[in-house]
Curated annotation (Swiss-Prot):
Organism: Saccharomyces cerevisiae (strain ATCC 204508 / S288c) (Baker's yeast)
Keywords: Acetylation, Chaperone, Disulfide bond, Membrane, Metal-binding, Mitochondrion, Mitochondrion inner membrane, Protein transport, Translocation, Transport, Zinc
Record function comment: Mitochondrial intermembrane chaperone that participates in the import and insertion of multi-pass transmembrane proteins into the mitochondrial inner membrane. Also required for the transfer of beta-barrel precursors from the TOM complex to the sorting and assembly machinery (SAM complex) of the outer membrane. Acts as a chaperone-like protein that protects the hydrophobic precursors from aggregation and guide them through the mitochondrial intermembrane space. Compared to TIM10, it may have a strong structural role.
Residue ranges of the motif Twin CX3C motif: 35-59
Name of the encoding gene: TIM9
Record-given protein name: Mitochondrial import inner membrane translocase subunit TIM9
Residue numbers of N-acetylmethionine PTMs: 1
Subcellular location field: Mitochondrion inner membrane; Mitochondrion intermembrane space
Membrane-topology descriptor: Peripheral membrane protein
Subunit structure comment from the entry: Heterohexamer; composed of 3 copies of TIM9 and 3 copies of TIM10, named soluble 70 kDa complex. Associates with the TIM12 component of the TIM22 complex, whose core is composed of TIM18, TIM22 and TIM54. Interacts with the transmembrane regions of multi-pass transmembrane proteins in transit.
Length: 87
């Protein structure tokens, strides 16, 4: 990023932030869709049953832990790749 001037750095940072927000929204949407589909079965009432609430909590925790693990592995791969290129 040293090759970019101040304005270019700001524009680049803005693009990165927009991508991060888009990725976060995609993650959130996938979480909602998956857990709703897997856990909500009773449409006779507007409230969740205790079973549905428990399922949603477990589903969301599992989904977020999985996403965190994937992110960590991605960072590890990037670090390894960066070290390989830095030789």
């Amino acid at each position: 990023m040293d090759a970019l001037n101040s304005k270019e750095q700001q524009e680049f940072q803005k693009v990165v932030e927009q991508k991060q927000m888009k990725d976060f929204m995609r993650l959130y949407s996938n979480l909602v869709e998956r857990c709703f589909t897997d856990c909500v079965n009773d449409f006779t009432t507007s409230k969740l049953t205790n079973k549905e609430q428990t399922c949603i909590m477990k589903c969301s925790e599992k989904f977020l832990k999985h996403s965190e693990r994937v992110g960590q592995r991605f960072q590890e791969q990037n670090a390894a790749l960066g070290q390989g290129l830095g030789r």
